[in-house]
Curated annotation (Swiss-Prot):
Name of the molecule in the record: Aspartate--tRNA(Asp/Asn) ligase
Disulfide bonds: none
Organism from which the protein derives: Bacillus cytotoxicus (strain DSM 22905 / CIP 110041 / 391-98 / NVH 391-98)
Positions of ATP binding: R222, D223, E224, Q231, E484, G536, L537, D538, R539
The keyword Signal appears for this protein: no
Amino acid sequence: MAERTHACGRVTVEAIGQTVQLKGWVQKRRDLGGLIFIDLRDRTGIVQVVFSPETSKEALEVAETIRGEYVLHVEGTVVARGAGAINENMATGQIEVQATKVTVLNAAKTTPIIIADDTDASEDVRLKYRYLDLRRPVMYNTFKMRHDVTKTIRNFLDTEEFLEVETPILTKSTPEGARDYLVPSRVHDGEFYALPQSPQLFKQLLMVGGFERYYQVARCFRDEDLRADRQPEFTQIDIEASFLTQEEILDMMERMMTKVMKDVKGVEISVPFPRMTYADAMARYGSDKPDTRFEMELTDLSEFAAGCGFKVFTGAVENGGQVKAINAKGAASKYSRKDIDALTEFVKVYGAKGLAWLKVEEDGLKGPIAKFFNEEEANVIMTTLEASAGDLLLFVADKKSVVADSLGALRLRLGKELELIDENKFNFLWVTDWPLLEYDEEANRYFAAHHPFTMPFREDVELLETAPEKARAQAYDLVLNGYELGGGSLRIYERDVQEKMFKALGFTQEEAREQFGFLLEAFEYGTPPHGGIALGLDRLVMLLAGRTNLRDTIAFPKTASASCLLTDAPSPVAGAQLEELHLKLNVKE
């Protein structure tokens, strides 16, 4: 078999007159009365191949048997297309290849999906036949971008003197965070490894080990409820460094992302990135990962609501809640009563009891709650919300957390429905000054807002014992277009502070030592101050590639139920395997 001389998408006018050897798949076959045209595709693109009796009767006879997705080896001569046949939409549109010889390397059945960017297949079919789905150019280009992003990050970190170090996949189960994926040990009866949710502890131990600058393109595993931007196994760019301040870490990450955007997308972004405290983000956007590509911020009307004539508003404030609103500028005519009812049902999903609304007309406020406000109160609403004729005002009165969640989600929905979001924008943002702990009323205990190894502000360390809810974290999240791209923090590196943190989380001394004794002991041997960040590679590529589903950036992803339609994983295993592992199943019928 002759070697390939050209990739299909790279045969250009410079090759006119040359004999070329091409290999690829049949994208399309057209029979035009004695002539057969085949679009031959490989990873680089498509080239048109012409079979004619004048050039080769033998090749034409073979071409008559060829169908879509056959794998071919074509030998032929590159010629210029006629003036009327030039296709400006193809990189190879000025030439075609006159086939002198063709070999079928492999035949193909009719594929269950159309191999094209615009396929008609459902996602389940695409995942079942993922190897065919990956042939679509849009998929190849996505994974080429993923490769380019990873390569750019590796090169950047190499220039910053970081070492790429692999950490264990089989590790110890720890109780914090999501559920672990467990792996039974055959050698140690009744004991289990866990797949890592992140390399957090090992990268900190590398800092104890004096490596100073570490990174890893790390595989992580979390047994949690899935959604469109979550997968049970995912990849993160894991970074840790000793002796760097928070400012130095943020600056380095900004330089890294600037290089990624320029090298991969050809987009210049400005630095430093805007910063917003966690409290400010929640107050203004109802989200700890605000999408700042459009306005429509939340406005607090609680002070006004406390003394107004609408009892729903006053009652919410009296019960310790708040009243907030968003102004959908110019949207009054775009939302009917039925449409607003749909918005009401939408906010109920986030815990809101309802959605109050007003439309602004030339002669004042109109809507079911307008009658509860006198002229002065109506003017306060108009002024506070900067409202004018044609605006739609939407209110939620409830607990603070419900108001933030429901209006934050409603803001995003309206931004999409009203086409306020510039899809070509890349708005990076740091969210800083997070609460260290979050209280779970059902569990009746505190949980770490990020993880148990996050350093509190120095002046807040004592609050761990007196008022844990007031302690602030030296933590920072990188947000891009409303998605959390990554989270990081300075880490605890002193044993006494770490023990105070464990105590605030409800660990007894014995539990802390049993779970994390190796880390606590390591902190007694000269641990340097350190910190880092972990960036979600899958999510970053999703955003840069303009995809809406994380599964499109993972070669062989799982479904929303954490199953693989291609391999039928997870699946039962033989009884002998379970016996070797000393396991008995207690499966509910």
